[in-house]
């Protein structure tokens, strides 16, 4: 785990998301895959798209620094409507039970769920967005669909999670969400999304995409560890990094902190002692502070997600987050 000394989170420079000013004349396009090899990855890592994405994730991390999930926020109508839309998608799962089939991973009923969402995703966005923003749906729909996993491989992983973050970024770019919504993007929207995809993982037995086994942070998620560590900086409950190995602490605080909720979920779905099934997370719990973990997680995200061809070869680029090789 990298513990390179970096400025405190409050010292990060934020240039903000650049909103599209003239939506009426902006040319939205269906996002496509662009990256195919290591040379493409090197270009991507130097690109404005990568810089903007990292900046956005860091901005959200800083916005929720030292703030538990129950923090009183603005909770705008836009945020409420997004949460309502995600909850509506969750009901699809309730109405499409898994098939009786002898498979460890990948229940084929997931494909029925995916098709149901595909059939409705445009209408869901039309209901969410004002008429003036409907031209952006061609891009938004692609990101939201991929944020739910892959219907061919019946899997879900960090690349799908990343596309959900990109979906919220695009909602910022078109001006549907504002800078004043950024706390809520994590504390209300992303937490609802996590509940949704964990439900998908459990009900349909989705295979982890590109898991590293006991050396993975989590078979499915990454970003809640970045944002969750930020939440725990300076927490009033004296929850230290090593505290996540204590079951009583996890049970007491998992509803308040993303990081601890991740540990709780891992302990629920994996068998055996924590230090055996999650060695990387166990080692990270030895870090000196949550600030160091937050900084290290950002570096690890850059190295293990954004720098990997198997993940970024599936990343979709459109007009709102663009890149060409």
Swiss-Prot record:
Transmembrane segments: none annotated. GO terms for biological process: mitotic spindle organization. SUPFAM superfamilies: PTPA-like (SSF140984). Disulfide bonds: none annotated. GO terms for molecular function: peptidyl-prolyl cis-trans isomerase activity; protein tyrosine phosphatase activator activity. Its EC number is 5.2.1.8. It catalyses: [protein]-peptidylproline (omega=180) = [protein]-peptidylproline (omega=0). It is an enzyme of class 5 (isomerase). The keyword Cytoplasm applies. Belongs to the PTPA-type PPIase family. PPIases accelerate the folding of proteins. It catalyzes the cis-trans isomerization of proline imidic peptide bonds in oligopeptides. Acts as a regulatory subunit for PP2A-like phosphatases modulating their activity or substrate specificity, probably by inducing a conformational change in the catalytic subunit, a direct target of the PPIase. This is Probable serine/threonine-protein phosphatase 2A activator 1. The gene is ppp2r4A.
């Amino acid at each position: 785990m990298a513990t390179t000394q970096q400025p405190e989170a409050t010292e990060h420079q934020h240039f903000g998301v650049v909103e599209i000013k003239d939506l009426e004349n902006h040319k939205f396009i269906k996002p496509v895959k662009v990256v195919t090899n290591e040379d493409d990855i090197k270009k991507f890592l130097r690109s404005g798209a990568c810089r903007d994405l990292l900046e956005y994730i860091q901005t959200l991390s800083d916005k929720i620094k030292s703030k538990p999930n129950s923090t009183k926020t603005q909770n705008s109508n836009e945020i409420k409507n997004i949460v309502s839309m995600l909850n509506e998608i969750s009901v699809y799962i309730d109405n499409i039970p898994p098939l009786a089939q002898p498979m460890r991973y990948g229940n084929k009923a997931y494909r029925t769920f995916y098709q149901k969402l595909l059939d409705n995703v445009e209408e869901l966005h039309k209901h969410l967005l004002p008429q003036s923003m409907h031209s952006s749906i061609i891009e938004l729909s692609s990101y939201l669909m991929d944020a739910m996993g892959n219907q061919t491989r019946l899997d879900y992983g960090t690349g799908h999670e990343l596309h959900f973050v990109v979906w919220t970024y695009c909602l910022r770019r078109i001006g549907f969400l504002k800078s004043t919504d950024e706390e809520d993007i994590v504390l209300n929207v992303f937490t609802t999304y996590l509940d949704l995809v964990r439900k998908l993982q459990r009900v349909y037995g989705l295979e982890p995409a590109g898991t590293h086994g006991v050396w993975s942070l989590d078979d499915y998620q990454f970003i809640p560890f970045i944002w969750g560590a930020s939440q725990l900086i300076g927490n009033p409950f004296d929850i230290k990094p090593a505290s996540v190995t204590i079951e009583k602490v996890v049970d007491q605080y998992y509803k308040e902190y993303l990081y601890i909720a991740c540990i709780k979920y891992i302990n629920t779905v994996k068998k055996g002692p924590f230090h055996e099934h999650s060695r990387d997370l166990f080692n990270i719990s030895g870090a000196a502070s949550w600030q160091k973990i937050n900084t290290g997680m950002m570096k690890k995200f850059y190295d293990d997600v954004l720098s990997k061809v198997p993940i970024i070869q599936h990343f979709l680029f459109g007009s709102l987050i663009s890149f060409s090789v």
